[in-house]
Amino acid sequence: MAYQTVNPANNQLIKTYPAHSDADVEAALQQADALYHSAWAKGDIEPRLAVLHKLADLIDSRAEELAKIASQEMGKLIKQSRGEVKLCAQIARYYADNAKLFLAPVKYPSELGEAWVEHHPIGVLLAVEPWNFPYYQLMRVLAPNLAAGNPVIAKHAS
């Protein structure tokens, strides 16, 4: 079964996308799992933060284009779409700037000895998201998990 994107303002077909086969889904899961087990996910956080900074810069550089796409596909006012795009760049930049602090080990006083909390990647995350805010719904899951080293696979809610 194919998926179609239709402009809700005029019912014009924008594009048809093929459905993913079971093999496609399995391949995506395997790639995400390989990334989770890689040095990229488990190693130093700096490369992941650099990706988030680059993502924020790319969103900013193409903000108007992204806003127009969201408005055309979702039937949203362009002002709302611009706000959503701007928010997504801010979210990516926020985690790029702060995740190192958020994920740093935290020591706690204890009468029984040393105690601390460490943060480590937990694995591949599957995000089933509504698409009424197509960029924001993904970014709010992607940015913190990318910083933490957790690959994310997203699927729209059906």
Task: Locate each region found by the language model.
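Conserved small-residue-rich beta-alpha loop and adjacent elements
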Residues: P105-S158
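N-terminal Rossmann-like NAD(P)+-binding subdomain of aldehyde/semialdehyde dehydrogenases
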Residues: M1-G113
